């Protein structure tokens, strides 16, 4: 392809399309057709040439073609792509160089390509204004569509739109043709959309179709046209469609699982949700007198009782009457109840009956399969599921919580996250593909360049030489170049040669200058002229300096790394104009919000041995940050511009020669069009924005620069930012006048400080350079806004400006790497998400308009159905804004409530369709793409902002200086003391000194290495400053040497960096000897160039291992630390004699006790018992005296046992070991708590508040179990490893949220108060109460009350935001915000409507981004941890992994004995029938049919229906029993050796029992129909038989793989729930029952607490549980409420404890555990997909062994050689070797044992090798494999190969040759001896036979002479294989002769 592309670039490649061209094409096409033989005309697509991707229609013309001659713009040209040479196409290029491809056939049969009409149409079509016009029309049209009640004149506008669209389509049809050929109008799917829209428009206009609004909604599709017009969107939509295709498997699995769960739900809860509490009929009614007869069943046909007195009572009518149901306040639906003991009970005077409709308008139910499915889908998406959960538990009983646990964990967490995993994978694949494409292009361009170079080498050598000398004769040349850059940019044949010569000269000049350069400016040189040229060329091709891939160049030679100081003495930042780095390296190199002071362009590799140089007084420094790519691009290009101007400027001239040399590299390749601004702007900038007027000014400037750029000033400014943030966060309501004036003054002061900083920086740097940098622009904007705000302080309505001050918080990112990284990730994602966000916006827009058009009217007309007052509810679709809000709410995952409303007013089907579409398309796909992008930007940024950490920022420098100062003072004081008191020689210690070790100076710079100073980096962790963590580099003259010595701010490398900082934190016991110290030093040194990541903890240290694995030699360690012993020498006791020895023996005894397994088991048992005991302390404990007493004693016993354990461990391990182990500390603290409460009880202080709260800490006891259970410990360790980064992200999120919280306080503080009626609890109308004073006037009956969760201060704001971010309780907050007016004013309904947008913005940034970041961090961390502790995986190549996995699977299997076929003829027939695959599949079909019949069941089906279904069920039971009997007959007792059969057997027995004892079972157990549901599990078996189900198998495989890990996480979650349940019971058992707390869901007992906590695990309904706890004083609660049976008084909660309890639980469970779950699933999913993508899967090996069983019925593991061919042919692909396969099998060289048998492993190994191909690693693996196989199958020990198939064949062939020759010899002998009397003819006849034999043997010989066979063997089996069998070969080389003789005759006979 590359070859074909090499049309000479420039105008020559463009040729106008003429009649001749058309004729030529036709001729070529005819020739090609003639050339091809018939057969080859349909060759496979693989080998067909493909169109060039760079010349596709819609792309821009590659740069290599140069400019289009003006006369050829918008004209038909011959196709540039060689692929289309013989196809009838032509191209047209517009001014923007976009390619349009057309068919060269006649359009509409009349317009030839050269027809003037068609030419005009083409000109219009390709013109950019045309697409602009269409774009504007679409947007305007969209605006008109959002009008809910359009005025009449819009009708005419509609016609205009239709007209424009029609015109567009006509133009397209005229230009392209309609539909027959390629590239015609209807060949583009996007045009189908246009076409249908236009047709619909005309149809609706002229034909009356009744429901017009439904059809008018089709106009909405016009919005989709934007996608086809905006270029980037098509690709995103492509990606979306791809991910939806990938989702098909997950979707099927999801639907299947949901169906199964829905069936279970249907069987368990059918009709339950209609159980209501109905009033017991009044005593005087006829009912009372007849109750007995009713219950005895005497009732006439219509449900009426007839009795003696003849008064009638209709029971059905009575219970159908809504007014008799018990309804709680504020609820729409009556209270549900159940008749089970653990179900909800009715109040006094009420009875539980099944009547009325289901809850929520009748839409929440399990009565039919479809409603059950909807309920399950809702559970899976976790929308308002707490409501379903509570209703079901209330109606059916608490035990059914198990059902919900299963559905939530398997359905919700697993399936939803699988969808995420699939989308992320699809995204990743797409990314890979684009990267590969880019690489491929690069290679092609390289090739082109090579070609160009060759073409142009010879032609113009002379001209070029003269040109070069002229060009570089002076600066003038540069100026000219600037002017003529458009010429220079063309890669015309002339310029290419010139480059080379110029470059050579320049090279030599550079070498000379480079050695004697005085100003210290270093230019990294690139290695070869070619590479420079190619790179620069590539750059200009893309116009994107970042496309260079990592391979392109090493960090050392970024093409043009030009120092800022070239341009002016003030700037010493290295800004490279073009830095070619790969994506990964680019991150954080120089950046947007960052100053580019130490933005060195070398990477960490080159940092290591760099020179350290101080910076000059005149240069500015600052901290480093990071840039987005576009920014870098802009800045680079702009700096290129500047450089040119600067050169023209006088100050730059003296250096010009050296610069010129480098600049010209890129000069010719940069087009003028790429300049950011016109040249006049730079001239203006030079004069007005760079202030260099006089010397005095320069001095002032210099001074200001010194001050402003000092790190201490930076530190001060950072402190000011923090203080300012604090001041802003201190606003609250109500605030005193004094406090508020303090805040105002503070604000003024800070504004002043920041303004001064900005002004000084501008003076120091000049405006021109000041605004070159992201951070400074940011500062400038904020300062200007603050000043504006001061000016406009008193203007009403501009308080919004105050919110901009909050952005100052972001300045912290300068010195806080994690925040910086986060902003960067969000920045990157927003860049990548730009298109996605547009697509999302289009989707939201379309659905909002559709909703408005379809349902708007219905909401208006049927509003009384959903609202008693007949007012529109808050969520409706009557206008565009509200419609948009509903769609947005659905995207947040809350769809069910709004859908109920919609279904009630507008009918079920349409609403279901629309809402499901929004839910599936919007929510699942788009939000998951969000996540996928976030995750991918994580992996590319590698979370740890490595580059940032490696650069020191000013803050660290300042802190470092302070640290040094303090150290200096400390050392001085120490020395004084030493001199005064100790006259000893100094011992050299490892310490942080400040001595300079070495100081080498030469003519270029100095390298200084200092001892390390410890700095706290941004995370508060100590990190050594040095190789690993931070390095800066400067280049200096030697005269700067002194300034260096005097400048203490420099940091320098030390050989061990991170290592030393680790020493600081090590425990002393870790190093028992010097050598160990040395070793660890080396170790640490090896890791010292750690990534500097926030996560990267030191490598696991010896101490940790010591803690986990007890010493082998059973010797206790020292009791005390060395420090203690030094200070108190008496602690050291001699263990050799006397008391010391007794003490030592005692310790040894204790040690052996503690280390004993039984001791540990006993302690675990005690821990479990004591934890269990806590669960009994509920509110009923007072009434159960015996239990209470028992528990008190037990508590004491447990406490004593634990104290004893602790003492034993102290004696055994010594204090040092005990107290350096974190788990021991945990034990210690928990024991202390028990001890304190014991002592307090003994002393009678048990009622003290402090003691009571201490007792609640006993809830932590179960934590001790953590260290004892391996599984949980693994998870905890992983979590602890993740804590630093989770904390980091949590902090960043808090900062992020702080901004929204402060903004919320500014907007809503004090405005949520409202006046309520104390009797009814309703809010007063605005007519009655307008403000606070009106409310006061009403006295007792009114109350001025605040919403519980509000924005009155920043803390409350945080809680409110957490509720919004988790979408729980957010409605109330939003309603309050939307209704609010001002402080002390009564709210009005939707007064402040657009406040919704505050929440929308917060949800997007605060919730989607930040909460997903947690997932990102955890997954990222997970991977990092795996890498750190991971096993071989990381050190294996991909190849090796493939083999390893195949082998792993291989080794674990072994052939089994098949079930023998019965000898009895009848049994044998049945056996054959049962073992066929068809039988299996038919049974599966029966199971599915059974499932369908179960789905048909409904709650209120007719008796006849019930009868039919039970008969059908009977049939199924008979069939399944039949299957069972058949299998039993044929398989005999072997039936029970297969797990699945036992399962079938149990199900069949249960079904039969269930059929006969249905009533009995239903009464005491569950509904017997459930047994039939269980049978569905068998469907799992069928998946193996279906080839197409591979995807689903993968998903299930992923689940199986994740189960162990998920079980561990589940255990941990249970532990957390347990602790919180105990804690909740002791704190919230008695709170007032309201909101989410009622008689069933509360913290009164352990069970109830667990039920509540399980619900909050998914963060569902936590607002409801928190609300009652926030009641802290009357009138919200009653502090003196009496609780019968208990001594506790009052039902008030404790808000601070409550908030802490719920927030911490949500963070732990929801963010951590649930996200760990996600991480595990994503991980295993990718592993599983890799597995399934491997050439050999688990199933292939299983299949191999299944076939093997038939050939080896006795499971000997051997097969005879003669059967091998049939065996190979019986396998399935990929292992299959079809017949004829003899030769192949022989060539495999398989080892054989006596009896010509071959072992299964050898065959499998050879076949596997055949599939996987050659590899050198096979030997080692093979040996490994055999070991494993031996271990699992001891029978193979006897296996000693004697020969191999190949050897056997060679033996056979050689035997044949020997025999033949021997026969010939015998014959000759005979001929000699035989007398001549025999006739010659007979002799002829005799000889004939051998001759025939010869021929046969010759043939064989030809096929397999030794050489040939060897050749073929080497192709099918690698030499490595031989090496394994070589020893064997030698072994049986000896036996060969005898064997041959033995075997000869036998074989001959066989032949």
UniProtKB/Swiss-Prot annotation:
Disulfide-linked positions: 864-870, 902-911, 1315-1335
Extracellular face of the membrane: 147-152, 207-213, 270-369, 387-397, 731-738, 794-797, 856-880, 897-907, 1178-1189, 1244-1252, 1308-1353, 1371-1393, 1497-1504, 1557-1568, 1629-1650, 1664-1695
UniProt-annotated glycosylation sites, renumbered to this chain: 211, 290, 296, 302, 307, 339, 1317, 1331
Record-annotated membrane-spanning stretches: 129-146, 153-174, 189-206, 214-235, 250-269, 398-424, 713-730, 739-763, 774-793, 798-816, 835-855, 908-934, 1157-1177, 1190-1211, 1218-1243, 1253-1271, 1285-1307, 1394-1419, 1478-1496, 1505-1528, 1539-1556, 1569-1591, 1605-1628, 1696-1721
Reactions mediated catalytically: Na(+)(in) = Na(+)(out)
Molecular-function GO terms, alphabetical: calmodulin binding; voltage-gated sodium channel activity
Domain IQ: 1851-1880
Gene3D superfamilies for the chain: 1.10.287.70, EF-hand (1.10.238.10), iswi atpase (1.20.5.1190), Voltage-gated potassium channels. Chain C (1.20.120.350)
Stretches for region Disordered: 28-60, 493-529, 587-633, 1068-1112, 1898-1951
Site (Key residue that permits the spider beta/delta-theraphotoxin-Pre1a to inhibit fast inactivation of the channel): 1510
Intracellular or extracellular location(s): Cell membrane; Basal cell membrane
List of residues that carry Phosphoserine: 484-486, 1452
GO cellular component terms, semicolon-separated: axon; basal plasma membrane; membrane; neuronal cell body; plasma membrane; sarcoplasm; voltage-gated sodium channel complex
Protein's GO biological process: behavioral response to pain; cellular response to antibiotic; membrane depolarization during action potential; nervous system development; neuronal action potential; response to pyrethroid
Cytoplasmic side: 1-128, 175-188, 236-249, 425-712, 764-773, 817-834, 935-1156, 1212-1217, 1272-1284, 1420-1477, 1529-1538, 1592-1604, 1722-1951
II repeat placement: 693-965
III repeat locations: 1139-1450
Chain positions of site Important residue that permits the spider RTX-VII toxin to inhibit fast inactivation of the channel: 1503, 1506-1507, 1562
Membrane-protein topology: Multi-pass membrane protein
I repeat start and end residues: 110-455
IV repeat ranges per the UniProt record: 1459-1757
Oligomer and partners: Heterooligomer of an alpha subunit, SCN3A, and 1 to 3 regulatory beta subunits including SCN1B and SCN2B; disulfide-linked with some beta subunits like SCN2B. Interacts with NEDD4L; could regulate expression of SCN3A at the plasma membrane through ubiquitination-regulated endocytosis. Interacts with the conotoxin GVIIJ. Interacts with the spider beta/delta-theraphotoxin-Pre1a. Interacts with the spider RTX-VII toxin (AC P0DL75).
Record text about domains: The sequence contains 4 internal repeats, each with 5 hydrophobic segments (S1, S2, S3, S5, S6) and one positively charged segment (S4). Segments S4 are probably the voltage-sensors and are characterized by a series of positively charged amino acids at every third position.
Physiological role: Pore-forming subunit of Nav1.3, a voltage-gated sodium (Nav) channel that directly mediates the depolarizing phase of action potentials in excitable membranes. Navs, also called VGSCs (voltage-gated sodium channels) or VDSCs (voltage-dependent sodium channels), operate by switching between closed and open conformations depending on the voltage difference across the membrane. In the open conformation they allow Na(+) ions to selectively pass through the pore, along their electrochemical gradient.
PANTHER family tied to this protein: SODIUM CHANNEL PROTEIN TYPE 3 SUBUNIT ALPHA (PTHR10037:SF237), VOLTAGE-GATED CATION CHANNEL CALCIUM AND SODIUM (PTHR10037)
Name assigned to this protein: Sodium channel protein type 3 subunit alpha
Lineage start: Eukaryota, Metazoa, Chordata, Craniata, Vertebrata
């Amino acid at each position: 392809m590359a070859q074909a592309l090499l049309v000479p670039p420039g105008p020559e490649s463009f040729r106008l399309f003429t009649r001749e061209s058309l004729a030529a094409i036709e001729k070529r096409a005819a020739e090609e057709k003639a050339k091809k033989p018939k057969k080859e005309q349909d060759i496979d697509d693989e080998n067909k040439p493909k169109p060039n991707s760079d010349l596709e229609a819609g792309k821009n013309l590659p740069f290599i073609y140069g400019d289009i001659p003006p006369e050829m713009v918008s004209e038909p040209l011959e196709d540039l792509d060689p692929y289309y040479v013989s196809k009838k196409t032509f191209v047209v290029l517009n001014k923007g160089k976009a390619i349009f491809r057309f068919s060269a056939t006649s359009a509409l049969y009349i317009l030839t390509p050269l027809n003037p009409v068609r030419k005009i149409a083409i000109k219009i079509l390709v013109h950019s204004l045309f697409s602009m016009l269409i774009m504007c029309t679409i947007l305007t049209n969209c605006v008109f569509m959002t009008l809910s009640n359009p005025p009449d004149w819009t009708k005419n506008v509609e016609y205009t739109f239709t007209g424009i669209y029609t015109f567009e389509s006509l133009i397209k049809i005229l230009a392209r043709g309609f539909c027959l050929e390629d590239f015609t109008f209807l060949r583009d799917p996007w045009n189908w959309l246009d076409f249908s829209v236009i047709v619909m428009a005309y149809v609706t206009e002229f034909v009356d179709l009744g429901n017009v609004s439904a059809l008018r909604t089709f106009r909405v599709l016009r919005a989709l046209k934007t996608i086809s017009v905006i270029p980037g969107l098509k690709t995103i939509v492509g990606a979306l469609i791809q991910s939806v295709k990938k989702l098909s498997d997950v979707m099927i699995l999801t639907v299947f699982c949901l169906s199964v769960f829905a069936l279970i739900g249907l069987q368990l809860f059918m009709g339950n949700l209609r159980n209501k509490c109905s009033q017991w009929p009044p005593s005087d009614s006829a009912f009372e007198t007849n109750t007995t007869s009713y219950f005895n069943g005497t009732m006439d046909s219509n449900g009426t009782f007839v009795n003696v007195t003849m008064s009638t009572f209709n029971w059905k009518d009575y219970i159908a009457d809504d007014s008799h149901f018990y309804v709680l306040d504020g609820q729409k639906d009556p209270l549900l109840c159940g008749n089970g003991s653990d179900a909800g009970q009715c109040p006094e005077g009420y009875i539980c009956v099944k009547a009325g409709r289901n809850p929520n308008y009748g839409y929440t139910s399990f009565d039919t399969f479809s409603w059950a499915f909807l309920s399950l889908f809702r559970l899976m998406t976790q929308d308002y599921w707490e409501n379903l959960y509570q209703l079901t538990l209330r109606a059916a009983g608490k035990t059914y919580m198990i059902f919900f646990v299963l559905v939530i964990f398997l359905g919700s967490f697993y399936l939803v996250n699988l969808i995420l995993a699939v989308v992320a994978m699809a995204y990743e694949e797409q990314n890979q593909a684009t990267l590969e494409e880019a690489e491929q292009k690069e290679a092609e361009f390289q090739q082109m360049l090579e070609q160009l170079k060759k073409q142009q080498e010879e032609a113009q050598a002379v001209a070029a030489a003269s040109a070069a000398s002229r060009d570089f004769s002076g600066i003038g040349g540069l100026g000219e170049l600037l002017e003529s850059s458009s010429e220079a940019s063309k890669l015309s044949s002339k310029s290419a040669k010139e480059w080379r010569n110029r470059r050579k000269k320049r090279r030599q000049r550079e070498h000379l200058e480079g050695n004697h350069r005085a100003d210290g400016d270093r230019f990294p040189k690139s290695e070869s002229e070619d590479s420079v040229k190619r790179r620069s060329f590539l750059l200009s091709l893309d116009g994107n300096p970042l496309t260079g891939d990592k391979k392109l160049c090493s960090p050392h030679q970024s093409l043009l790394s030009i120092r800022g100081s070239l341009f002016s003495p003030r700037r010493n930042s290295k800004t490279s104009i073009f830095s070619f780095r790969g994506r990964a390296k680019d991150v954080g190199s120089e950046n947007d919000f960052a100053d580019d002071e130490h933005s060195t362009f070398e990477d960490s590799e080159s940092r290591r041995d760099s020179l350290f140089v101080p910076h000059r007084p005149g240069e500015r420094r600052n901290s480093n940050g990071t840039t987005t790519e576009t920014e870098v691009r802009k800045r680079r290009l702009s700096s290129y511009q500047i450089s040119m101007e600067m050169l023209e400027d006088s100050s730059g001239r003296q250096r010009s020669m050296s610069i010129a040399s480098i600049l010209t590299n890129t000069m010719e390749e940069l087009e003028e069009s790429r300049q950011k601004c016109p040249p006049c702007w730079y001239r203006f900038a030079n004069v007005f924005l760079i202030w260099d007027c006089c010397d005095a000014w320069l001095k002032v400037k210099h001074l200001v620069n010194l001050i402003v750029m000092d790190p201490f000033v930076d530190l001060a400014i950072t402190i000011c930012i923090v203080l300012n943030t604090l001041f802003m966060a201190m606003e609250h309501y109500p605030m005193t006048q004094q406090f508020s004036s303090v805040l105002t003054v503070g604000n003024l002061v800070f504004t002043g400080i920041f303004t001064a900083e900005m002004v000084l920086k501008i003076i120091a740097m000049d405006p021109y350079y000041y605004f070159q940098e992201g951070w400074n622009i940011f500062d400038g904007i904020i300062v200007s806004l603050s000043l504006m705000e001061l000016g406009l302080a008193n203007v009403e309505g501009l308080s919004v400006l105050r919110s901009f001050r909050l952005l100052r918080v972001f300045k912290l990112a300068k010195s806080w790497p994690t925040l910086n990284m986060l902003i960067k990730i969000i920045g990157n994602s927003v860049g990548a998400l730009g298109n996605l966000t547009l697509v999302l916006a289009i989707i939201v827009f379309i659905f909002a308009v559709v909703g408005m058009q379809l349902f708007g009217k219905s909401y208006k007309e049927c509003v009384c159905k959903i609202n008693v007052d007949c007012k529109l509810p808050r969520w409706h679709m009557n206008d565009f804004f509200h419609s948009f809000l509903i769609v947005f709410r659905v995207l947040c995952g809350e769809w069910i409530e709004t859908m109920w409303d919609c279904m009630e007013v507008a009918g079920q089907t349409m609403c279901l369709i629309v809402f499901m579409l929004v839910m599936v398309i919007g929510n699942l796909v788009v939000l998951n793409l969000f996540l996928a992008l976030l995750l991918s930007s994580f992996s590319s940024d590698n979370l740890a902002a490595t580059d940032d950490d490696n650069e020191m920022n000013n803050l660290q420098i300042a802190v470092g200086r302070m640290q040094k100062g303090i150290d200096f003072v400390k050392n001085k004081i120490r020395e004084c003391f030493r001199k005064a008191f100790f006259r000893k020689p100094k011992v050299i210690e490892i310490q942080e000194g400040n001595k300079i070790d070495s100081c080498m100076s030469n003519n270029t710079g100095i390298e200084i290495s200092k001892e390390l100073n410890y700095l706290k980096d941004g995370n508060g962790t100590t990190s050594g400053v040095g190789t690993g963590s931070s390095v800066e580099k400067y280049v200096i003259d030697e005269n700067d040497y002194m300034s260096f010595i005097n400048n203490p701010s420099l940091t320098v490398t030390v050989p061990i960096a991170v290592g030393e900082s680790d020493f600081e934190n090590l425990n002393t016991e870790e190093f028992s000897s010097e050598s160990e110290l040395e070793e660890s030093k080396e170790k640490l040194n090896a890791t010292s160039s750690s990534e500097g990541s926030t996560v990267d903890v030191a490598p696991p240290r010896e101490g940790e291992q010591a803690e986990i694995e007890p010493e082998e030699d059973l010797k206790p360690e020292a009791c005390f630390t060395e420090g203690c012993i030094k200070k108190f020498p008496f602690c050291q006791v001699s263990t050799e004699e006397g008391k010391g020895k007794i003490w030592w023996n005692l310790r040894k005894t204790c040690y052996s006790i503690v280390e004993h397994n039984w001791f540990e088991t006993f302690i675990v048992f005690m821990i479990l018992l004591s934890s269990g005991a806590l669960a009994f302390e509920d509110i009923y404990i007072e009434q159960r005296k015996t239990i209470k007493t028992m528990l008190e004693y037990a508590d004491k016993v447990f406490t004593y046992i634990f104290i004893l354990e602790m003492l034993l461990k102290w004696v055994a391990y010594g204090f040092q070991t005990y107290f350096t182990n974190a788990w021991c500390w945990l034990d210690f603290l928990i024991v202390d708590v028990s001890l304190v409460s014991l002592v307090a009880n003994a002393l009678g202080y048990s009622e003290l508040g402090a003691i009571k709260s201490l007792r609640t800490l006993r809830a932590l006891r179960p934590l001790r179990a953590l260290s004892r259970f391996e599984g949980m410990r693994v998870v905890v360790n992983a979590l602890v490893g993740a804590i630093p980064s989770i904390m980091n992200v949590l902090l960043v999120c808090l900062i992020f949220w702080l901004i929204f919280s402060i903004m919320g306080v500014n907007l809503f503080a004090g405005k949520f108060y409202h006046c309520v009626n104390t009797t009814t609890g309703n809010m007063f109308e605005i007519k009655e109460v307008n403000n606070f004073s009106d409310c006061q006037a009403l006295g007792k009956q009114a109350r001025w009350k605040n919403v519980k969760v509000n924005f009155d201060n920043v803390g409350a704001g945080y809680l409110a935001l957490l509720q919004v971010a988790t979408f729980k309780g957010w409605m109330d907050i939003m309603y309050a915000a939307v209704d609010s007016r001002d402080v002390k004013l009564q709210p009005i309904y939707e007064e402040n409507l657009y406040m919704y947008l505050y929440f929308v913005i917060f949800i997007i940034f605060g919730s989607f981004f930040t909460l997903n970041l947690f997932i990102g961090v955890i997954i990222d961390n997970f991977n990092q941890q795996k890498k750190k502790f991971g096993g071989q995986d990381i050190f294996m190549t991909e190849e090796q992994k493939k083999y390893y996995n195949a082998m792993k699977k291989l080794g674990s299997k072994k052939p089994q004995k098949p079930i023998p076929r019965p000898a009895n003829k009848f049994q044998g027939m049945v056996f054959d029938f049962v073992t066929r695959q068809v039988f299996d599949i038919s049974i599966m079909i029966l199971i599915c049919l059974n499932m369908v019949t179960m789905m048909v069941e409904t709650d209120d089906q007719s008796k006849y229906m019930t009868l039919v279904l039970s008969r059908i069920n009977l049939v199924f039971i008979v069939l399944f029993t039949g299957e069972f009997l058949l299998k039993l007959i044929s398989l005999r007792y072997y039936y029970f050796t297969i797990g699945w059969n036992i399962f079938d057997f149990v199900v069949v027995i249960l079904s039969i029992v269930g059929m006969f004892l249905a009533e009995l079972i239903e009464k005491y157990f569950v509904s017997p129909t459930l047994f039939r549901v269980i049978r569905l599990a068998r469907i799992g078996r069928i998946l193996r038989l279906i080839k197409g189900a591979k995807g689903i198998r993968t998903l299930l495989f992923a689940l199986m793989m994740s189960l162990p890990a998920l079980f561990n996480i589940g255990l941990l979650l249970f532990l957390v729930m347990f602790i919180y349940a105990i804690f909740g019971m002791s704190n919230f058992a008695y709170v007032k029952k309201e909101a989410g707390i009622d008689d069933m869901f509360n913290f009164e007992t352990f069970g109830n607490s667990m039920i509540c906590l399980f619900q909050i695990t998914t963060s569902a309904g936590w607002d409801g549980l928190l609300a009652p706890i926030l009641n802290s004083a009357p009138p919200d609660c009653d502090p003196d409420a009496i609780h019968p049976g208990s001594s506790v008084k009052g039902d008030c909660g404790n808000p601070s404890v409550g908030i802490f309890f719920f927030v911490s639980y949500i963070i732990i469970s929801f963010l951590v555990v649930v996200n760990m779950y996600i991480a595990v699933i994503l991980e295993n999913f990718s592993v599983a997909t890799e597995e399934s993508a491997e050439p050999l899967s688990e199933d292939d090996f299983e299949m191999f062994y299944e076939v093997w069983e038939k050939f080896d019925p006795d499971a000997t593991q051997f097969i005879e050689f003669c059967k091998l061919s049939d065996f190979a042919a019986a396998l399935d692909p990929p292992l299959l070797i079809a017949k004829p396969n003899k030769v192949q099998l022989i060539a495999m060289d398989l080892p054989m044992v006596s009896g010509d048998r071959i072992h299964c492993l050898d065959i499998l190994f050879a076949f596997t090798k055949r599939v996987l191909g050659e590899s050198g690693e096979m030997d080692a693996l093979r040996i490994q494999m055999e070991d494993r196989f031996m271990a699992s199958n001891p029978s193979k020990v006897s296996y000693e190969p004697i020969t191999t198939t190949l050897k056997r064949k060679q033996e056979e062939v050689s035997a044949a040759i020997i025999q033949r020759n021997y026969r010939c010899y015998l014959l000759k002998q005979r001929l000699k001896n035989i007398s001549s009397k025999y006739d010659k003819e007979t002799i002829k006849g005799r000889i004939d036979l051998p001759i025939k034999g010869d021929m046969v043997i010759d043939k064989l010989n030809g096929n397999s002479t030794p050489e040939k066979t060897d050749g073929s063997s080497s192709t099918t089996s690698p030499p490595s294989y031989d090496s394994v069998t070589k020893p064997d070969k030698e072994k049986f080389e000896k036996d060969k002769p005898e064997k041959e003789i033995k075997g000869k005759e036998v074989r001959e006979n066989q032949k």
